[in-house]
């Protein structure tokens, strides 16, 4: 299964979302990106693949993929 986390600018900072649900809001883009990557790595450890997308203005600005190292 592929799990997707989105990092997007909000009025109050940067949010991390999964399936439309806000998992957290952070003051900086880098902090939000770090949190999203941690969520993705944890998901990948359990056999799923995960992707972190930075979304701005409705467009994907950056995308990073994480896969399980369990074979």
What do the predicted segments below correspond to?
Residues 19-31:
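A short, exposed loop/beta-hairpin motif centered on an aromatic-Gly-Thr core
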Residues 1-3, 31, 43, 70-71:
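Short, solvent-exposed secondary-structure boundary motifs
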Residues 1-22:
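Short aromatic-glycine-(Arg/Gly/Cys) micro-motifs in beta-strand/loop hairpins
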Residues 6, 28-31, 65:
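Short capping/connector residues at structural and topological boundaries
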Residues 45-70:
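Short, mixed-charge low-complexity intrinsically disordered segments
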Residues 17, 26, 62-64:
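Short acidic, gly/pro-rich beta-turn/loop elements at beta-sheet edges
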């Amino acid at each position: 299964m592929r799990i997707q986390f989105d990092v997007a600018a909000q009025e109050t900072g940067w949010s991390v979302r999964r399936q439309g649900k806000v998992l957290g809001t952070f003051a900086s883009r880098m902090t939000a990106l770090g949190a999203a990557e941690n969520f993705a790595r944890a998901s990948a450890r359990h056999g799923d693949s995960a992707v972190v997308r930075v979304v701005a203005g409705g467009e994907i600005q950056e995308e990073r993929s994480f896969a399980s190292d369990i074979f």
